[in-house]
Design a protein with these regions (language model features):
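Intrinsically disordered, low-complexity, charge-dense segments enriched in Lys/Arg
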Residues: 111, 115-192
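Basic helix-turn-helix/winged-helix DNA-binding cores
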Residues: 3-113
């Protein structure tokens, strides 16, 4: 008998559950939890990538870091080691680079430096990611509202994170659908 191929064009409940599970319990290390001692380039890249493991397209390479240093987005390493402040900046960059230009990322950094410390800015970023990600991934039914009096930096941060996390969600959905499609030829072959 002839068996037709089934191609998934929408997500079934199991796929939705797997995508939602990506967001369950997600958290970023706070500024005080980032290594206080400098890290070499490979260690820096490994640490940043470990924070976003499981999210396709959210990754950093050594050449990207070198490019960000060359363009002045982050400062030069001291004795080839990257500081806590640079790690925090790279964690922000790796998430936002898919939705903002480097020029706009630099502008946001300048705005934040004018109003708060690197630790405060980074911890606000972490809080906002952890607020938005579960909601967008369907693991939470609510999201904290922005204060109506929130400054421009907070509004721009929220907008950046909502856009970036929506892109992460879409990438996870499409990966799940492709994985499902890849299973069908083997399953159908077993039925013959």
């Amino acid at each position: 008998p002839e068996v037709k191929m089934r191609y998934t064009t929408s997500m079934d409940q199991e796929m939705k559950r797997r995508v939602t599970a990506c967001a369950a319990g997600f958290s970023l290390p706070r500024y005080r939890e980032l290594p206080a001692v400098g890290l070499y380039l490979d260690q820096t890249v490994q640490l940043v990538n470990s924070c976003f493991r499981g999210f396709p397209g959210v990754e950093l390479t050594p050449s990207m870091v070198s490019n960000y240093v060359k363009k002045g987005v982050i400062s030069h390493p001291v004795k080839k080691k990257y500081s806590r402040e640079q790690l925090a900046a790279l964690l922000y960059i790796v998430l936002s680079k898919n939705v903002l230009s480097l020029e706009n990322i630099e502008m946001l950094f300048r705005m934040q430096r004018a109003h708060c410390t690197a630790a405060e800015a980074y911890d606000s970023f972490c809080d906002e990611v952890e607020n938005c990600l579960p909601f967008i991934f369907g693991a939470s039914s609510s999201i904290r509202d922005l204060d109506p009096d929130a400054n421009d930096e907070k509004r721009l941060l929220r907008g950046t994170i909502v856009a970036a996390v929506n892109k992460m969600y879409l990438d996870c959905c499409f990966v799940a659908m492709r994985q499902e499609q890849a299973l069908w030829p083997g399953i159908l072959g077993d039925l013959e």
